[in-house]
């Protein structure tokens, strides 16, 4: 009996996970990596995040799909690097800033009620200095970049369970 329940649970997990992944359109992500975990480095990371979001709005704001958005990022990657480096210099940072596009690994991330599963995604990555600090990421296309400093400051962590969501959908939210 326990073996059957385990097998059923495993199948449910796999089915629900693949169904969630199929519902998402192709994505293009942004990844900004701080030099280290000092207050100054983390503040610079947030400043450069803002620069990237403003540049992305102009660069890919009217892109018809993820492929077009990514191609525009590739065409303008040097512009992102230049804009970030200029802002960093204004703030007194003298280290290296690099920008690159490619396919990078990302962890699970919950944006409101939308779960973006872990995996390889096309992205623009901005690396500050050695890139050994905490990072910030979002979805540039379609836009899921939410900057909510109040939630971040609260330290509240929201947990998400695919199995629990699958069960809620079938039982009607009783759980």
Where are the language model's segments positioned?
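Hydrophobic membrane-insertion alpha-helices, especially the h-region
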Residues: 3-20
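Early exported N-terminus immediately downstream of N-terminal targeting peptides
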Residues: 26-74
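Solvent-exposed coil/turn segments that connect beta secondary-structure elements
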Residues: 33-37, 102-104, 129-131, 141-144
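Sec/Tat-exported extracytoplasmic proteins
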Residues: 36, 52-63, 77-95, 171
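Mid-length scaffold segments of soluble, non-membrane domains
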Residues: 70-123, 127, 131-133
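Soluble extracytoplasmic domains of inner/organellar membrane proteins
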Residues: 114-166
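Extended, compositionally biased alpha-helical segments that mediate assembly or anchoring
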Residues: 174-175
């Amino acid at each position: 009996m326990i073996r059957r329940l385990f097998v059923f649970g495993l199948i449910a997990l796999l089915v629900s996970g693949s169904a969630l992944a199929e519902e998402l359109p192709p994505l293009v992500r942004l990844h900004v990596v701080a030099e280290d975990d000092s207050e100054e480095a983390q503040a610079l990371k947030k400043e450069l995040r803002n620069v990237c979001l403003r540049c992305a709005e102009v660069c890919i704001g009217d892109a018809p799909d993820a492929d077009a958005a990514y191609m525009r990022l590739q065409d303008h990657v040097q512009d992102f690097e230049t804009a970030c480096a200029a802002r960093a210099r204004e703030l007194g940072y003298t280290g290296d800033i690099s920008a690159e596009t490619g396919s990078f690994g990302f962890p699970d991330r919950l944006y409101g009620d939308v779960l973006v599963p872990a995996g390889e995604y096309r992205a623009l990555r901005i690396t500050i200095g050695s890139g050994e600090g905490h990072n910030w990421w979002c979805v540039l296309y379609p836009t899921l970049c939410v900057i909510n400093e109040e939630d971040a400051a609260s330290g509240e962590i929201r947990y998400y369970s695919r199995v629990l969501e699958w069960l809620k959908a079938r039982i009607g939210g009783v759980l």
